[in-house]
Amino acid sequence: MESTLKDIRDGASVLDLDPKATVGGGVEDLYGEDFATEDQLVTPWTVSVASGYSLLRDPRHNKGLAFNDKERDAHYLCGLLPPVVSTQELQERKLMNSIRQYQVPLQKYMAMMDLQERNERLFYKLLIDNVEELLPVVYTPTVGEACQKYGSIFRRPQGLYISLKEKGKILEVLKNWPERRIQVIVVTDGERILGLGDLGCQGMGIPVGKLSLYTALGGVRPSACLPITIDVGTNNEKLLANEFYIGLKQRRATGKEYSEFLQEFMSPVKQNYGEKVLIQFEDFANHNAFDLLAKYGTTHLAFNDDIQGTASVVLAGIVSALRLLGGTLADHKFLFLGAGEAGTGIAELIALEMSKQTKCPIEETRKKIWLVDSKGLIVGSRKDSLQQFKKPWAHEHEPVKDLLDAVKVIKPTVLIGSSGVGKAFTKEVIEAMASCNEKPLILALSNPTSQSECTAEEAYTWTQGRAIFASGSPFDPVEYNGKTFVPGQANNAYIFPGLGMGLVISGAIRVHDEMLLAASEALARQVTQENFDKGLIYPPFSNIRKISAHIAANVAAKAYELGLATRLPQPENLVKYAESCMYSPVYRSYR
């Protein structure tokens, strides 16, 4: 065996390498892959050296027709493949041509998931090189439909399913996962999937999709990523009655049973993977999301993308839009439709940044921000009946029953939708915004597209082309009065991959609000005048890896500044360091 394990760096045998976790975008491979450059030979290890038919069935090492003649001979592949030798670039062109033949987005999603299951590097090569085209396929809005139909399209397990049946043995379940050095976990309980509600165990599509973006956009190694679904039941009657439903067929656990089960999950995660594993809470219902973040944000490297990631990306859009609107954050007035995780999270980060800029207490800067929920404007007279996370936004004002009246009374310069209620920004609402603003900033953030508060065409048309618009789901360019408007997408994918990479490369042990502000500032700086000329307040996704490297560097710098980083000494050039740590999907040559 030792004869096959050749020295790969500085004359050191791979058997003598220190098996510590790397500081880069993944876990350390003791058998050479993490140390090898793209032109060096690596050994395709699984439990043993993969060869023959098993190598073709191993998605991490399979290259399909790109195995050259020498590799086919050395790894017993002769006869198992047609004789032609392809390149990765040719494979990419062929697959993109095939995917473009599908008319139904869900078919494209399934084609991409099939590719991920058989050829991991080619999957990420496609996604990185065609990110603007494929991002809506592998994530929002298509992933929402995929989750709704997950039971029917389920083929091969991806990630860990931890249900109430595993109570008392969660550590054992975690140890069943084949990778030991996990750096990023995305976990959901499926109760609030996008704007689609309780999808129970079928919410697994969200962690899987998110982690594919951590790799493609942020450069975190796939083997360092772990998607997890916590199955505590579902209250979705259609799923409970569906014979194809893949989860527990019982109503959701709540209260003490739920909190104890989550505690039993969080403790062994830290025990098994260490203090520096990032745990991203995803699509938990409001009543649990805030409690979990408050409880575990001080004891774990925990992050809620719906609360913190959304807030960071929206703040970045607002900060960049100020170059079009003029003034500072404190010069503007904000009105939200939706006072859940996203709405209150965005509002709090805006208030925090405003407080930082003006040196005013956050209690004062919050007064520039108003929220509307299902019962109307959140005001002081409602304070006793409000959930705890809404109370900071209960300002003194007469009751206002609906959004239109709130716009007329508050006269905001920025209107933000995070309600999950499609078409909530009516013509009257947007016209009211246009009547009191030369350039109203309208952010319709709810996903998927069907739940968006308004479309790009509606925003531009009803404001006579004066709106600055961005949305949570993608919209096509709009022609109005001979001018083409390109709507921006306030997609969390701008933030969380770079944020995660920044936490990984710095070895951070906690997520601090200052890191979220640092991520926002880095993203806002990437918007160019050319982008503004097209009406964009976010940079194009085609540059996402460069954007993520700058975000990672800014986040890591803040971690070092706050004393929360453990990877010492601090690299001199954090941007270059982040880029060097990013996973490359280019095929490796096998010895």
Swiss-Prot record:
NADP(+) binds at residues 335-351. GO terms for biological process: malate metabolic process. The active site is at Y139, K210. A divalent metal cation binds at E282, D283, D306. It catalyses: (S)-malate + NADP(+) = pyruvate + CO2 + NADPH; oxaloacetate + H(+) = pyruvate + CO2. Its EC number is 1.1.1.40. Divalent metal cations. Prefers magnesium or manganese. PROSITE patterns: MALIC_ENZYMES. The keyword Membrane does not apply. The record marks D306 as: Important for activity. NAD(+) binds at R192, D306, N447. One of its GO terms (molecular function) is NAD binding. Keywords: Cytoplasm, Metal-binding, NADP, Oxidoreductase. It holds the Pfam family malic. Homotetramer. PANTHER family: MALIC ENZYME-RELATED, NADP-DEPENDENT MALIC ENZYME 1. Belongs to the malic enzymes family. This is NADP-dependent malic enzyme.
